[in-house]
Amino acid sequence: MAEEASGTSSSVVALPQKVTLYSYHLSSCAWRVRLALLFKGIPYEYKAVDLLRGEQFTDEFTKLNPLQMVPVLAIDGVTLVDSIGILLYLEERFPDKRPLLPKDLVQRAQIHQVVSLISAYIQPLQMGGILATIEAKFGKEEQLKWIQDIFRKGFSALEQILIRTAGKYCFGDTITLADIVLVPQFANAIRLQVDLAPYPTIQRVGEALNELPEVKSSVPANQPDAPKL
Ligand SMILES: N[C@@H](CCC(=O)N[C@@H](CS)C(=O)NCC(=O)O)C(=O)O
């Protein structure tokens, strides 16, 4: 990874006055935004939206996001929806606070390729609603096969990319947006009992990411709306 992405928090850009993240502890998309806010050192208020109880369908929440999904981020007097749009806003608004994209255009494109592979292929095909429909129509066994197939195709492609680009993390030894989207997907793979043996690079990078303090504090179990054990 080029040095330009390895900067520290040297920015003089003032922090926004109030930042509110609408999140659900188990949402992988909201987890991406929690991570970016933590890496960039932007304090935020956590507003829980209980997806299991259907709070995303209330009139109040639909006004914030007509697609009725988390995450939503209120920042700088605007309301932003969609995790990738939010990540790009944070990166462009606070480019010097722990940069998550390098300046090199080819590397940026490769990082966007990984972000897209995970956020536009792997994650949408295993959303809770889709898995519930498959289970209801075809049963638990077919649902598991569906999950395994998505991961097999998605992670095989990702492994081939990361073999060439990874250092300690997805692109060299610097955290980028690719790592931000990988963290929740890696956790989902483990939760859904995906065999990671065919993907040694993903496994190594995922485990290295899990050691970071920002990752530890952003995990679902550490969110205010996680069930108390
Ligand atoms: N492309 C959107 C997808 C957001 C998304 O899929 N959110 C899920 C949780 S990870 C959700 O809110 N689902 C609510 C539902 O399925 O009713 C993003 O990246 O933010």
Task: Mark where each language-model region is.
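Short, solvent-exposed turn/loop segments enriched in Gly/Ser/Thr/Pro and often Arg
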Residues: 24, 50, 177, 222-223
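C-terminal helix/juxtamembrane-tail motif
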Residues: 215-229
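A generic structural-conservation signal
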Residues: 46, 70, 198, 218-219
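Generic structural signal for helix capping and beta-alpha/helix-loop junctions
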Residues: 31, 54, 206, 226-227
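GST-like fold's C-terminal all-alpha helical module
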Residues: 106, 114, 118-211, 217
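GST-like domain detector, emphasizing the conserved glutathione-binding G-site
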Residues: 2-145, 149
